[in-house]
């Protein structure tokens, strides 16, 4: 009974649980303190339990003549671990200490607040050579610094008789480029330049933050530079919530070649009266058998116009093509295809009837090729 009371007191001292709750776990474990503690922390879901290995008899501390105690106290075990980093390993508890064995319970690591994490990042960067820069002075200095011209040109002759000579410009390897990145440290995460917020707690960002803390350039930034120099600025926004910056339009500054249009613009030279006359002729050219089923087909033209024509169900898709050419004679020399809208599909077999192609009362779009 005395052993059970001792186990109950140690359980309460280690876990801080109420006596009734402690008794429940001990009774469930058959009054085995180690099993009860393990069950308690598994129920909590956070704590890890580590059992210290049994030392050999030669490593056991022997008492002096002045003291006949052969049991290591909690105070001795705690003092032996004072040099450990409690912030990294979590709070330690000891239970069941004896001459030859002991149980050490290590709580979960204390998570750092975002403010502490940002402070550590700046501290680590400064320890590895980073310097604080005045943002206003930096921006004004960068804008006023002239950039030398690195292109080619012609050196003019000093006299009329002296010929001009072409001078080649500086060659730069396209594969090597300098990269300037701004790392913004916010209240709940960080962002790169105008990118999305990345959480401090996301495991996929742990390596990136560790590299910054060690004063190293993260691998993802080195890949951007392709062997060039990476200039990294860190901005402290730890007291601010992340605000997504407004997207800024950036004009294309690269090089390219102007290609010919694959879809030449169709210019209609017909007057409105002439166009109406052409549409009337095209409509009359479609022979409609009133004794057979009829359907209306709406045609959206590539020039923005719209035609609506009545067809029999046994008319074919090629009849629609001929109708378009008759209504818009300028398209006779233009290559185009006919497509459905929903689903968007090209009508490749123009020998199909409208009924076979499921085009009854459909909308057809003309697309230039």
Swiss-Prot record:
The keyword Cytoplasm applies. It comes from the Eukaryota. The keyword Cytoplasm applies. Keywords: Cytoplasm, Cytoskeleton, Golgi apparatus, Lipid-binding, Nucleus. Residues 291-367 form the UBX domain. One of its GO terms (biological process) is autophagosome assembly. It is found in: Nucleus; Golgi apparatus, Golgi stack; Cytoplasm, Cytoskeleton, Microtubule organizing center, Centrosome. Pfam families: SEP, UBA_4, UBX. One of its GO terms (molecular function) is ubiquitin binding. Residues 178-243 form the SEP domain. A motif (Nuclear localization signal) lies at residues 109-115, 172-175. Its main location: nucleus. GO terms for cellular component: centrosome; cytosol; Golgi stack; nucleus; VCP-NSFL1C complex. Residues 46-115, 133-156, 260-280 are annotated as: Disordered. Residues 260-277 have a biased composition (Polar residues). Residues 67-81 have a biased composition (Basic and acidic residues). Belongs to the NSFL1C family. Reduces the ATPase activity of VCP. Necessary for the fragmentation of Golgi stacks during mitosis and for VCP-mediated reassembly of Golgi stacks after mitosis. May play a role in VCP-mediated formation of transitional endoplasmic reticulum (tER). Inhibits the activity of CTSL (in vitro). Together with UBXN2B/p37, regulates the centrosomal levels of kinase AURKA/Aurora A levels during mitotic progression by promoting AURKA removal from centrosomes in prophase. Also, regulates spindle orientation during mitosis. This is NSFL1 cofactor p47. It comes from Gallus gallus. The lineage of its organism: Eukaryota, Metazoa, Chordata, Craniata, Vertebrata. The gene is NSFL1C.
